[in-house]
Amino acid sequence: GCRWQLFAQNTELQGGESKTWRFNGRFKCNFKANIKANLKANLKAKEPAPKSVVLATTTLTYNADYLSQCHVIPWVSFASPPSSIASIIERGLNDDDNFFNKREKKDVFGWRHYGEIDADHEALNAEVPDEFISHYNNQYDPLLGMTLQFLQGGDLRWLALIRPLQQHIQDIDIYDTDKDKAEYNGGLMWHTDHYLSAQTCTHRSNSKYHEHAYDGFLGGGGPGGQHCYTSGLTLQYWLFGDPSAKQSVAQLCAWIRNFYNGSGSLLERTFRLLTIDIKSNQLTNIGFKAPGYKYPLDRGTANFIIALIDNYDLTAEPALVLEMATIIRHTFHPNEDIGLRDLKNVEQSWFYTIFLQAVVRYLLLKESLEEIDSDYWYARDGLIHFGRWMLNNESYYLDKPQQLEFPNDTWCAQEIRKANIYYYCYYFCSDHNPQYLHQAKAYYEYITQRLSTSSEAVYTRVLAILMQNDGVEQVFLGHPPQSAVPYQRIEHGAPPKLTLTTAIKHFLFDLFRLSANFSLAREYRWLAIRLKMLMNT
């Protein structure tokens, strides 16, 4: 018989990796005319005829006005003039150190790494930066950011970066297995730890040469809740109909749920009681959890909410919206004493801003569904409560560099989160406080002025943050919008307090609930994996 040997017989894979092979074919009736037209166009432009002219594909761009009007991505606008940070973002395409040239410098063309973005910011203090390899693993969702840029202006160079990146994320960065711990299975691999060369670790785990950096298991290397990005993958399904992207979103959503809520094991729930629930103001394996709350006020919880939102956008399952509300209620409170959060300890708590951004997306979703209920008002009042605190207490991170471990311009890029929160606090606040608009504009001016002259502005992490958060400023140009939902005062009661009695009560309730689906195999598996790890250390 006839055999098509299109693909290599053997492909080296590490745990949780996969390899997707694709080939393109084209069938066109007016085949010769198409070739002649392309050749004629190239000759007229005095350009050589491309070898791929026969397999050239048609690429469609989207009308920016239409995208803005239909609110398919409701928290940004595409129809307005470019944002104030657009020229900085465009350096990712036009600068000498653009994304394409970064790939060339590091020779990132092997199948495992192709599409990956070079984490050049980690080489800031390296002796030989061009020989420093660090894996980025989609931190701050550049897949989303680049896709938003493609939709914003239709520049096909973004598309040339997006397509291999999304395949790399699905094949390599996502830990596609069910044979590890539940809090690892199906998760997104963490980026290489800061300012360390990847050495021998590829994308999978810590290198043996990193032992000094992982004391106390605080370093990167494996899946962790604070590194979960689903929005870029969601857009790949919406725009290109990629079913594997949709499946990856569902998988990441299930993983991060297991990471924070557990897999249903009674032993696991008991372990959480001892290591997380009864601890107060301490760093735990899910993050820094304030007394009385189940979830930490950080980017991990934000990622959990965003994953649920993205999964809902793809499936329309109502239970996901209720789950978002439950997480928000167990993370902050509209009447809490924010001073107890120690938010001025920037290194430990700056990512509360990412949580507030997730609350904004939840509120916009609730408004689009016309679900104006107690969950909506809890989240809205909580957002404004923290927004007022920000007006009176927040300042630029780099104004106090002594409070930062690495005072570089990544901190300047992170200011865009505060700016966008201020904009949406204006949108949701009942008194239409103009201070929110003033602060938002001031922050954008600060970011633009500083990064326009910064040599660090072209670094991958800086650009990823800006791209991920671009588009909000345009929403508020001209006549700034305000929520059409009339304000309604709701009593939210007192914020929760941590006591041993309440922790044990919640524990016993969970044991009763979990016992309904008790599985001896699940309990054995949970214990066996951990005993095996202990024996190997």
Walk through the language-model features, giving the residues of each.
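Membrane-proximal basic amphipathic "stem/tether" segments
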Residues: 272, 476-537
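Eukaryote-biased recognition of C-terminal alpha-helical segments
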Residues: 393, 397-429, 441-492
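Catalytic cores of extracellular degradative/oxidative enzymes
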Residues: 1-30, 44-388, 395, 427, ...
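Intrinsic-disorder/low-complexity, polar/charged segments
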Residues: 31, 317, 430-433, 453, ...
